[in-house]
Amino acid sequence: MRQVIIARKDLNMSPGKLAAQCCHASLAFLTSQMRDRSQMSKLYRDGEVVAYNPFGMIIEKDIYEEWISGIFTKTICEARNRNQLMKAVSIAQGLGLKEGIDFFLIKDSCLTELEPEEVDENGVGRTLTCIGFKPLPDDIAHQISKKFQLYK
């Protein structure tokens, strides 16, 4: 079991920016569940919410036993550009994987070194930097990563 992350090479991200974007991609499958407040218990003090407990998450047995309790294996690949990165989306969808559940598109808010490629519904400029997959069985991960080279 391994997690595949594919980052865009054409953006020429600094090492720090690249690391941050890959970290966002790695954590996305967990943080997507943590952000669902309907599933959280709340801690109240004087009638006000002072904390959330987002850890009532449901994590697939194989992911928990082989990845979270294991060695957190990751493969970081490079995409030449946005179009090649989007090919990973097509491959994933062809394998029956779903965006927002099995893979996550990471878009930078362009507050530091990147220029916006698009503007979101809130008027915030964003640039697609990478795609992160939840931990996948090695054979599925390989079907995605074999089309990309390791990030150099």
Name each model-derived stretch.
Residues M1-K152:
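Positively charged, small/polar-rich N-terminal and surface patches that mediate targeting and assembly
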